[in-house]
């Protein structure tokens, strides 16, 4: 039995972020839709060829998306909210962009659909909206067209389709409540149609993604799998594909499904391979996700080989990536500034494709034939264990010395609140922003020129100072109560801190997609983390010197820095988070000693870090909360600690959020129409809260009445004296004109409420 190899998906953005640049040019009206479509086509062809050149046998087709793959599935099924439809009912690319962004070059603007995290990653998807009794039709040909493209180029094609159960699971009911699983019967005929058309094109295998199978599913959702796949069987071979965790808890359901194979994630999951093998029908393909699609580390192929060789010849096997390579940067060969030692530890998407191919080749050869080649390939990752760049004795000693008192503020919130009110004397409904202001071309050019050595430190600091002054002046003109310095010096809220920590390295081109055209370049944690010197104090004190109003110090929290970095794999996430927390603790202390009275420690990734299985939640929340408190508890009573969270469902982690003991929490609520506040109301959240009053991911400017309406909803759940007024998130991706207009309306709404409540 020959062992085949494949990938579950490939990054779509392009090595130089060509997709991002083309999307944004199109949205700005600088290129035509035809030009945008041409960029997409060129990227797909390039990416298929890169995988084929690396030795990948079965190429994923359908992993390309103009925004995200869930939204692509919504279009495929004709599931478009009425407010985003064209008047003639047809779907086009602008329809897709209106759903995602609230506006597009054509069509009427309307509120964007909600966006949330893709499982426990830092990737996002647009949440499908469902209404009772709605119908579905095959309305979007993108997948079928792309299959034709790949076939025409001579590739061995494996289409990728998001499965019906996971699609329904990821969506949300809009309007009167009903069981969205009841829509399954309406959706299945469209899936049947798609599979039929793929069969007619000569497709043998379809990768049907059902990552919901790694979750704790209600019994009715578990049972729905049999119904769904009974309807879908018989046209093409189906590879039921799971990732991000194990599936042993649903093995009894899976083994009885009428599919032809199963893909499991052996990097994130703890499944016992022999148990899975014994349970599955012997003629099924078992696809083993042994090359980690979510990190940048080279695989120890010797270990991976030993992990799977026992199954060789016992059943049909495929070797693959654990998940889509979407979560990995594209090509390590583009990194020319990493030193040779560190570079030898890494593998990006292209290199991971080669790992998949090499491992499959070794498994297909007589046992032992590739031992030397695998050992040679894996040698750097083994040598790393002894590198002095990885281990720091001082950090280890400081971690060892942490005690329970280090995580507790001096006084409880009620006492701190009195001290802080006396210090700041804010009005009711105090207004603020979340931290960043528009990152203009000018700001980005200054940072790039400094990075490339085209300007010196003096010129750089003068330029950044001017932008900070502009941000302070703008906020004073608008009448905001608590100001921020605008973060002109920061390229990214995690990378900026990583650049000032020891234990990190940075890539030139290690971009990964976060959502739509938004890309991030996560830093890589290669060793123990420490802070050699203050990071934010200079800019914070400069900004504070420009105004009598308080200026917030802005830090990214330990859990978010961890979640939005590529972490080490040789120590626990808890250890990394606490190392970061100790570094931030020193920064908090330096800020307050420098006269900064309000310090925001952002933790937008707190929920994202949750394990996918609920029985593992508490252990994670315990150390995540401990890490935050360790970073913040050095603050004096009169220092007000804020935190910010976004894209969150809070109901099930309210105790942990309250346990953070931040004086003020700001959250993203506008897209969900303040629904998230129900959690705070039912829990009787004791501290202050700033529910986001407008969606910064959309360029639409909210009017005063809209904001007042949202704040009245908020006030029906939280007493006015504990409410703050702020946008959903930072404003770095917005333009100044829409930012001014939106903040002016926000301040006006707060003033109106002060006079009318």
UniProtKB/Swiss-Prot annotation:
It comes from the Bacteria. Zn(2+) binds at residues 644, 646, 668, 729. Its cofactor is Zn(2+). L-methionine binds at residues 434-436, 487, 602. InterPro entries: Cbl-indep_Met_Synth_N (IPR013215), Cobalamin-indep_Met_synthase (IPR006276), Met_Synth_C/arc (IPR002629), UROD/MetE-like_sf (IPR038071). The active site is at residue 697. Keywords: Amino-acid biosynthesis, Metal-binding, Methionine biosynthesis, Methyltransferase, Repeat, Transferase, Zinc. It is an enzyme of class 2 (transferase). It catalyses: 5-methyltetrahydropteroyltri-L-glutamate + L-homocysteine = tetrahydropteroyltri-L-glutamate + L-methionine. 5-methyltetrahydropteroyltri-L-glutamate binds at residues 17-20, 117, 518-519, 564, 608. Belongs to the vitamin-B12 independent methionine synthase family. This is 5-methyltetrahydropteroyltriglutamate--homocysteine methyltransferase. The lineage of its organism: Bacteria, Pseudomonadati, Pseudomonadota, Gammaproteobacteria, Enterobacterales.
């Amino acid at each position: 039995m020959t062992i085949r190899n494949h990938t579950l998906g490939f990054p779509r953005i392009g090595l130089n972020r060509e997709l991002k640049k083309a999307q944004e040019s199109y949205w700005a009206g600088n290129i035509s839709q035809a030009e945008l479509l041409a960029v997409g086509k060129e990227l797909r062809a390039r990416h298929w060829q890169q995988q084929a050149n690396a030795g990948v046998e079965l190429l994923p087709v359908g992993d390309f998306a103009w925004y995200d793959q869930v939204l692509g599935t919504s279009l495929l099924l004709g599931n478009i909210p009425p407010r985003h439809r064209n008047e003639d009912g047809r779907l086009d690319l602008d329809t897709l962009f209106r759903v995602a962004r609230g506006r597009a070059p054509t069509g009427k603007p309307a509120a964007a659909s909600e966006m949330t995290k893709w499982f426990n990653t830092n990737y996002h998807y647009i949440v499908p909206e469902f209404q009772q009794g709605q119908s579905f039709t095959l309305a979007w040909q993108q997948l079928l067209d792309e299959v034709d493209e790949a076939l025409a180029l001579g590739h061995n094609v494996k289409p990728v389709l998001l499965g019906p159960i996971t699609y329904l699971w990821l969506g949300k009911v809009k309007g009167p409540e009903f069981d969205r699983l009841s829509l399954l019967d309406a959706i299945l005929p469209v899936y049947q149609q798609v599979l039929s058309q793929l069969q007619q094109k000569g497709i043998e295998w379809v990768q049907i993604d059902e990552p919901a199978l790694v979750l704790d599913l209600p019994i009715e959702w578990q049972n729905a799998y049999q119904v769904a796949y009974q309807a879908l069987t018989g046209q093409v071979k189906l590879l039921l594909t799971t990732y991000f965790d194990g599936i042993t808890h649903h093995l009894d359901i899976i083994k009885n499904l009428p599919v032809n194979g199963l893909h499991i994630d052996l990097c994130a999951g703890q499944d016992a391979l022999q148990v899975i093998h014994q349970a599955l029908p012997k003629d099924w393909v078992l696809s083993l996700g042994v090359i980690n699609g979510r990190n940048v580390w080279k695989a120890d192929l010797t270990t991976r080989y030993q992990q799977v060789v026992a199954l060789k010849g016992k059943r049909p096997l495929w070797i693959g990536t654990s998940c889509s390579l979407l979560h990995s940067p594209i090509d390590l060969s583009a990194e020319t500034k990493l030193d040779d030692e560190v570079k030898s530890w890494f593998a990006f998407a292209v290199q991971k494709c080669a790992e998949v191919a090499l491992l499959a080749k070794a498994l297909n050869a007589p046992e032992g034939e590739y031992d030397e080649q695998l050992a040679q390939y894996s040698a750097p990752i083994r040598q790393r264990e002894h590198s002095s760049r990885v281990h720091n004795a001082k950090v280890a000693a400081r971690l060892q010395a942490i005690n329970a008192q280090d995580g507790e503020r001096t006084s409880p919130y009620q006492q701190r609140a009195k001290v802080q009110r006396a210090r700041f004397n804010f009005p009711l409904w105090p207004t603020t922003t979340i931290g960043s202001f528009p990152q203009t071309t000018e700001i980005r050019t200054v940072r790039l020129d400094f990075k490339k050595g085209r300007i010196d430190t003096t010129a750089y600091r003068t330029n950044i100072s001017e932008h900070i002054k502009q941000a302070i002046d703008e906020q004073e003109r608008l009448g905001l109560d608590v100001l921020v310095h605008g973060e002109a010096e920061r390229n990214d809220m995690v990378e900026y801190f990583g650049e000032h920590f020891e234990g990190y390295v940075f890539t030139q081109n290690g971009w990964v997609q976060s959502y739509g055209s938004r890309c991030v370049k996560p830093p890589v944690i290669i060793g123990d983390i420490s802070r050699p010197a203050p990071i934010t104090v200079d800019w914070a004190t400069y900004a504070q010197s420009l105004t009598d109003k308080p200026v917030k110090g802005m830090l990214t929290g330990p859990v978010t820095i961890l979640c939005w970095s590529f972490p080490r794999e040789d120590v626990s996430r808890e250890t990394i988070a606490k190392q970061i927390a100790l570094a931030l603790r020193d920064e908090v202390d330096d800020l307050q000693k420098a006269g900064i009275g309000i310090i925001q420690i952002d933790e937008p990734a707190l929920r994202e870090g949750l394990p996918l299985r609920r029985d593992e939640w508490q252990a994670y929340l315990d150390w995540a909360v401990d890490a935050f408190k360790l970073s913040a508890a050095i603050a004096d009573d009169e220092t007000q600690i804020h935190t910010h969270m976004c894209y969150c469902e809070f109901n099930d982690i309210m105790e942990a959020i309250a346990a953070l003991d931040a004086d003020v929490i700001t959250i993203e609520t506008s897209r969900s129409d303040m629904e998230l506040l129900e959690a705070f109301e039912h829990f009787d959240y004791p501290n202050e809260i700033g529910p986001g009053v407008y969606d910064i991911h959309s360029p639409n400017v909210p009017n005063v009445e809209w904001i007042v309406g949202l704040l009245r909803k908020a006030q029906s759940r939280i007493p006015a004296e504990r409410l703050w007024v702020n946008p959903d998130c930072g404003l770095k991706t917005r333009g100044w004109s829409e930012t001014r207009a939106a903040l002016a309306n926000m301040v006006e709404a707060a003033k109106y409420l002060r006079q009318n409540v």
